[in-house]
Amino acid sequence: MSKIIGIDLGTTNSAVAVLEGGEAKIIPNPEGARTTPSVVGFKNGERQVGEVAKRAAITNPNTISSIKRHMGTNYKETIEGKDYSPQEISAIILQYLKSYAEDYLGETVDKAVITVPAYFNDAQRQATKDAGKIAGLEVERIINEPTAAALAYGMDKTETDQTILVFDLGGGTFDVSILELGDGVFEVHSTAGDNELGGDDFDKKIIDYLVAEFKKDNGIDLSQDKMALQRLKDAAEKAKKDLSGVTSTQISLPFITAGEAGPLHLEVTLTRAKFDELTHDLVERTIAPTRQALKDANLSASDIDQVILVGGSTRIPAVQETIKKELGKEPHKGVNPDEVVAMGAAIQGGVITGDVKDVVLLDVTPLSLGIETMGGVMTTLIERNTTIPTSKSQTFSTAADNQPAVDIHVLQGERPMAKDNKTLGRFQLADIPPAPRGIPQIEVSFDIDKNGIVTVRAKDLGTGKEQNIVIKSSSGLTDEEIEKMVQDAEANAEEDKKNKENAELRNNADQLVFTVDKTLKELEGKVEEEEVKKAEAARDELQEALKGEDFEAIKEKTESLNEIVQNLSVKLYEQAAAEQQAAGGAEGQEAPQNDDVVDAEFEEVNDDDKENK
């Protein structure tokens, strides 16, 4: 069975891992880094992904980052006149991860386990699966990030039973999961979180502070200047990271903008104390989900054996201090917060292929599922933190006499009223025979698969008529749309490959022109003038072709010039060899005389030496 890669598709950074020799290994990207920025840029019809796109963001307005925050919504990015859904942008990132994983493994990769925040709803999970499909990946499993982290942490600790709390604060989302580990079973007891809390929010607090300080000093609002804002974003992220290791950092942005008197510079010293003050409310927001997870698992802080930190934002000292204070124990520092999720996904891939044995993963659904019933109430069928896969049925009836159809409004959430919860989808069970209200028996069944994706079925028990849907949110893509996006992605991959080949062809042609000029100088007076003119004409033709975009012509002229230069070089070497041979022959005739003279003199000198001795 082909290898299944594990992908952590993050808000700010992504990573890919594979199981090798029973161990999960992070695959470095072409730049040698172990994580790749989740950034996509479009420039002159070309796509850039990762560090290249992130570096160019200051000057390229067509740069997209943190797209994960829009997964499962109708959000669209319009770039160069074309609309892109979050699934398509995510697919571009996945395609890039897939391509360098293939280069590393030396084989085609078409299967993956992709992680999502535990608190992702059905629409967000479905969107992630669609992104994988667009990227040319068969998504074998969608796995929760904290669960993946627990897998990576607990693989070598299966002998002892322990309860662990995974605290996952990434670039855009926050999750807390509590798991029981023992005898190779990883059982999730509860999960809670906040999909709108992450490192991006900490960065924004610094940006807002810098904008306010600059406005106070100079009367100019930098938030209206796109280029300045991008520079502030990069500086804020760097300052945040610096303050995890030092207590004060200097933010210096020369020529950030211009005033009436000329260029203006931003110089601010940010202390850790000020950063903690700015982000205090964000850190506080991690406490409620942590307490909720403990409550749902019927545990207290003292029942937790180990606290695992996941996500780059857990490096913030105030975050670590809050966890320590809340749970009364030092967090475990033995895992890399940026890599552990991808490694866990790779291990899950190994479980699927059978390379990892004696491991059972029991995850839960993060939010309750139900339908809207009379009075706009949400009636829950599956409670949150129910182990998945699972299914549940309940019988309902009509609300009016002779009601011909029932609308099934599928909901996900914890609020008592339907309008306050997330709509997953709607469908209708029609052709119900006329009957007084309360008589027809309508059975509604919910199924949640191992990926946390929901199927709902409604059946009229009287007629046996049935209707079912795999939930597609309002943002969900149809099979036709996905197929079109798959084709677009494949075409783009081909185009990217072609662009790379064309760039290499152009570089080789440029190099050849340079080499020819050098060679012709060396050949002056050594080969016939006619041969030199022929080479110069071919060189000029290639230079002319290089001014255009006809790559077939460039290729043809390059090959033609190459052939002429090779023939010239052969003639030069033949001529040099002939000259050497002629010189060698002349030396051969003179050599005996010279040898006699030298030998005679040498003999005499030696004799004199002997006599002197």
From Swiss-Prot:
<keyword id="KW-0067">ATP-binding</keyword>
<comment type="similarity">
    <text>Belongs to the heat shock protein 70 family.</text>
</comment>
<dbReference type="InterPro" id="IPR043129">
    <property type="entry name" value="ATPase_NBD"/>
</dbReference>
<dbReference type="InterPro" id="IPR018181">
    <property type="entry name" value="Heat_shock_70_CS"/>
</dbReference>
<dbReference type="InterPro" id="IPR013126">
    <property type="entry name" value="Hsp_70_fam"/>
</dbReference>
<feature type="compositionally biased region" description="Low complexity">
    <location>
        <begin position="578"/>
        <end position="591"/>
    </location>
</feature>
<keyword id="KW-0143">Chaperone</keyword>
<feature type="region of interest" description="Disordered">
    <location>
        <begin position="578"/>
        <end position="613"/>
    </location>
</feature>
<keyword id="KW-0597">Phosphoprotein</keyword>
<feature type="modified residue" description="Phosphothreonine; by autocatalysis">
    <location>
        <position position="173"/>
    </location>
</feature>
<dbReference type="InterPro" id="IPR012725">
    <property type="entry name" value="Chaperone_DnaK"/>
</dbReference>
<dbReference type="GO" id="GO:0051082">
    <property type="term" value="F:unfolded protein binding"/>
</dbReference>
<dbReference type="GO" id="GO:0005524">
    <property type="term" value="F:ATP binding"/>
</dbReference>
<feature type="compositionally biased region" description="Acidic residues">
    <location>
        <begin position="596"/>
        <end position="613"/>
    </location>
</feature>
<dbReference type="GO" id="GO:0140662">
    <property type="term" value="F:ATP-dependent protein folding chaperone"/>
</dbReference>
<dbReference type="Pfam" id="PF00012">
    <property type="entry name" value="HSP70"/>
</dbReference>
<keyword id="KW-0547">Nucleotide-binding</keyword>
<comment type="function">
    <text>Acts as a chaperone.</text>
</comment>
<keyword id="KW-0346">Stress response</keyword>
<protein>
    <recommendedName>
        <fullName>Chaperone protein DnaK</fullName>
    </recommendedName>
</protein>
<dbReference type="InterPro" id="IPR029048">
    <property type="entry name" value="HSP70_C_sf"/>
</dbReference>
<dbReference type="InterPro" id="IPR029047">
    <property type="entry name" value="HSP70_peptide-bd_sf"/>
</dbReference>
